[in-house]
Regions:
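…primarily DNA-binding HTH/wHTH and HhH modules…
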Residues: 140-167
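Basic nucleic-acid-binding alpha-helical/helix-turn surface characteristic of O6-alkylguanine DNA
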Residues: 1-113, 164-167
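Short Lys/Arg-enriched helix C-cap and helix-to-coil transition segments
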Residues: 130-137
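Regulatory, non-catalytic segments
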Residues: 114-126
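Thr-Gly-centered strand-to-loop micro-motif
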Residues: 103, 133, 147
Length: 167
């Protein structure tokens, strides 16, 4: 697994943490994560397909955050994610840009209507947030629920999509 530092220069408050990290396998992106102080920031030398996947993901995430991209085409590698969680994430990936669905909605589509809490847990463990848009999944009562990058970022990602979806 290779990693690439993804620096985002922006005035948006939900990205006041100055950068994200990406990890990939030869099959696709395996992780999107917030880089925190104290982590090794030395450059990683990627090669071949992994390097291309990381470059593509960086470009697509920057376009998304600039409101210029509504879906991702970069391959994602969820092979290490348990089957139920993978199915829930694949369903979340189908939620249209600028829209939200509930944890229960996903559970029902998976044929497990009583598994809304398990869907919530799957979203909380999403290894590739933003690319697989778990921020578009909310509680049935309309409350946001949780988000691995924090609720303020979830709110801001949803607002970004609402704002750019209006055009």
């Amino acid at each position: 697994m290779e990693q690439l530092d993804l620096r985002l220069e922006t005035q948006k408050p939900f990205l006041s943490v100055s950068h994200l990290g990406l990890a990939a396998s030869h099959a696709g992106i395996t992780r999107v994560f917030l880089r925190r102080g104290g982590m090794d920031r030395s450059p990683i030398r990627e090669a071949g397909r992994v390097r291309e996947i990381l470059k593509e993901a960086r470009r697509e995430i920057k376009e998304y955050l600039a409101g210029k991209r509504t879906f991702f085409t970069v391959p994602v590698d969820l092979s290490q994610v348990p089957p139920f969680e993978r199915s829930a994430l694949e369903m979340a990936a189908q939620i249209p840009y600028g829209e939200v669905r509930s944890y229960k909605w996903i559970a029902e589509r998976l044929g497990k209507p009583d598994a809304a809490r398990a869907v919530g847990n799957a979203m909380a463990r999403n290894p590739v947030p933003i690319i697989v848009p778990c921020h578009r999944v909310v509680r049935t009562d309309g409350n946001l629920g949780g988000y691995s990058f924090g609720l303020i970022r979830k709110e801001n990602l949803l607002e970004l999509e609402r704002r750019h979806n209006a055009y």
